[in-house]
A protein has these predicted regions:
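Active-site loop of short-chain dehydrogenase/reductase
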Residues: 7, 62-63, 90-91, 136-150, ...
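Substrate-binding pocket helix/loop in short-chain dehydrogenase/reductase
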Residues: 105-106, 110-115
Length: 293
């Protein structure tokens, strides 16, 4: 697998969870990582800040640049990108990980919450990618990665939480369009999504508490999958909507996924948006919805 040594990553929402796991995996290679996130001070319910994340990245072997940035704000994003380039000399990889979630139906979704999800998930992804693009075009193997789902248009993914689905699919539509647009520039644009729930604060605080955490995988599976994405040739590997374990199995040759499980005695819970025809690797069993009650 290609090393990310001396590569520069610009990652949104990397103060904790999936974004931090991706950053630390790159740091093990000796990468340089700009952490663009809002959490500068400790949160009562959420672990980690950009400063604690920076220390973890440095402890893992990387160089970290923590930047307070609201990705909905055009000026803040421009400053964050400019600071990254002036500090590290460029940007090789852009990871759009920041996301807002509210699993409410239409009547229960106030417009402030709707605007938050659209602003972070869709607009923020577009803005960050657009801002990084001039620098990515000068990189030797440039990648843009959205942490967003395959574009499976089945109504079941929309009926319970229309606003959230629109916002997440907005990220995926960026992949669809930008991959085609940037093909001539050799900039890869791909999406990565977990087959199962991932043990993050969103799962614990928003969705299912400690029980769902025990039925989840660790964020390291996405970190390993993202690292494998960045190892692919950007000129030819683009426009893909990847499911973590299938990609690791088919391209990375991974056959054992047990070490990613939080609790091996519990069934694995399926994530949203995974198409019905996407089958897990041999030996991986995913729980039915009825088993999650």
């Amino acid at each position: 697998m290609t090393s990310l040594k001396n590569k520069t990553l610009f990652i949104t929402g990397a103060s904790r969870g999936i974004g931090l796991a991706i950053a630390k995996r790159a740091a093990r290679d000796g990468a340089k990582v700009a952490i663009a996130a809002k959490t500068a001070e400790p949160h009562p319910k959420l672990e980690g800040t950009i400063h604690s994340a920076a220390k973890e990245i440095q402890d893992a072997g990387g160089i970290a640049l923590p930047i307070v940035c609201d990705i909905r704000d055009e000026e803040q994003v421009a400053r964050a990108v400019a600071l990254t380039v002036s500090t590290f000399g460029g940007i090789d990889i852009c990871v759009n990980n920041a996301s807002a979630i509210s699993l409410t139906n239409t009547g229960a979704t106030d417009m402030k919450r709707f605007d938050l999800m659209m602003g972070i998930n869709t607009r923020g992804t577009f803005l960050v990618t657009k801002s990084c693009l001039p620098h990515l075009k000068r990189a030797s193997n440039p990648h843009v990665l959205m942490m967003s789902p395959p574009l499976d248009m089945h109504p079941r993914w929309f009926g319970g939480h229309v606003a959230y689905s629109i916002a997440k699919y907005g990220m995926s539509l960026c992949v669809l369009g930008m991959a085609e647009e940037l093909k001539k520039d050799g900039v890869a644009v791909n999406a990565l999504w977990p087959r199962t729930t991932i043990a993050t604060s969103a799962i614990k605080n928003v969705l299912g508490g400690e029980k769902l955490i025990s039925m989840s995988r660790s964020a390291e599976i996405l970190a390993d999958a993202a690292h494998l994405v960045f190892s692919q040739p950007s000129k030819t590997f683009s426009g893909n909507f990847l499911i973590d374990d299938t990609f690791l199995h088919d391209v990375g040759g991974v056959t054992d996924f047990e070490h990613y499980r939080i609790d091996k005695t519990m069934p694995l819970a399926p994530d949203f948006f995974v198409p019905a025809d996407s089958k897990p690797p041999l030996g991986v069993k995913i729980a039915r919805i009825s088993e999650l009650a």
